[in-house]
Structure formats: C-alpha cells, structure tokens
Amino acid sequence: REAGLDHILTSFPSIDKKENDYIMQSNNSLEKIMRGIKACVRNGIRISANMVILRANMDKIYDTGKLAASLGCDKFFITRAVPPSYSETSKSDNSTEDLYNLTHEETKKCLDEVLRIKKDFKMRVGSLVSYPLCFLEDLDKYRDFVGRGCPSQSGHRMSINANGDLHVCVHEEESYGNVFKTSIQEVYQNEMRTWHNKSKRYSGCKGCEYIEMCESGCQMISAAVNGETATKDPLYVGPNNVKKDFNLVDDKGIYDVIKKNEKFKVRNTLRFRQEKGFILVNIRWGNTISV
C-alpha cells in the first residue's frame, strides 16, 4: 500500500478445497487465497477475484462468488479457459468431453450464475477473456461482458516475460523479441502489427456491425481449438446475430453541464501514449481507448 498499489487481481478457482488445490497445483491454496484477500481488505487495497471456468468447477460459480463477496472482494470475474497449445482440445463446438470448451448452453448458464451473484451480493462482475457478441445475443442483459473485445487486437496490450521475451497476449507462446535486446517501441510498431491490422479477425465475421467491438472473440482460444488464429471462436454463432443491442447510459446531467459551458476536470491519473496515426488514452485501470 505504501508503494502506491491500489488494486490486486487474484485467482479464485473454486470454493472446493481439493479442486482448488488441483487447479492451482498448490497445497492449501484456498486458505492462502482467503488470507491474501483479507490482508488486502485490511490495508485498503481493492481486490478482484478471477474464476477461470472449466467443466470441473462450473457448478460452483455461485458459491465461489458468494465467498469472494463475503471476504470483501470488489469484483468477481468469470473467465473463459484458454487451452494450452499442448492440450488435446476438441474440434467440436459442443463437445461434452472437452475440459476447457463448454457448450453454448453451459456457458450461458455460467454467465447467468454470475449475474445472480451481481444481484444477490451487489458485486461488480465481468470477464478477462471476451465472448463473441453474436453468442451473447442479448447485449443489454449481458452488458457486463460486453466492450472488452480483444485488447491484443486493439493494440492495448504487450506482455513481458520474466526473461524479457515479448508477447502480445499473455496466452501466446510466440515471442516477438526480447526487452534486453530489442526496443519495445520497435517490436510494438513492427513485429506485433499483425495483431493490430485486423488480420486476426475470422472471415465469417465480415459485415457484422459489432466487429470493431468484438474482434471475433478470443483468437487464442480459436488457435488452441483450430490450430491457428483468424479462425472461428468455439462460441461463434454468426454475423449480426445480436437480438438486443447494448444500451448506452444516457446521463442528462452531463448534457446540462455541456449546455451551461461549465468546465470539465480531467483526472490527474489519465495517461496518453502517442502511436502512429492515433493516440491511446488510459482512462483508469484496464480501460484504454484509441483516439
């Protein structure tokens, strides 16, 4: 806290002790997670819990979220599992034997459980890995899972390994350079451009009005399932399958302030980064937009 840390994201795989140990590959992991959360709360540090959903723990979402809320977590993320490249993932969209890829119906049930957590415990919810918007269909109901898109394709992300290797997505094996040998700017502007020039989008998404926000779901999951990026996300349904659009918050008070020519104050934590042809603006936490 004294160093300026104001937020921590922790993994919280399951309320079940044995299951939690198996997923984390660590003994007494649940107790350690709970102890860490309590320490953060005591010291005034915001903490969010992230539950990666597998077929093994999907039935414990509500109880795990309930525990996270009782411990003082600010937000509960339900995140799609990204299969490792060495795993034997199923090529079927609706396989019941696949550990990582849930069926469309199972995934919707998981999202509904998270919305129940939000309602019952007044807890903010979300996801760290995007869902294809054509799969969500009702963007107003599932608004908490809309808008993240793919930070890697948006140019908002770069991952640096402990050894200095540079990746775009945290789930990616390919290295584009090394921070100890190459300029970060050079790697970002040149080597990583294939992620930023729309070539990672699935061709079946062409013409969809939500493609700029969706970016064809998660291309690392697509790569794990199909063997390469720019392919179909397992939850893909089809372009323009959104049945209910996302409704923007219309705050009349903001328009009144504008009409009165009143001054706006910009947060001193706002950050800008000049790129080629655009500027990235980090509003707060992980919220970054291009202008």
Predicted regions and their residues:
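Flexible mid-to-C-terminal extensions adjoining Fe-S/redox cofactors in radical SAM and related proteins
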Residues: K141, D165-L166, V170-F278, I283
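Long, charge-rich, low-complexity alpha-helical segments
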Residues: R284-V291
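Radical SAM enzyme [4Fe-4S]-AdoMet core and its adjacent flexible, acidic
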Residues: E2-H7, S11-Q153, R157-N163, H167-H171, ...
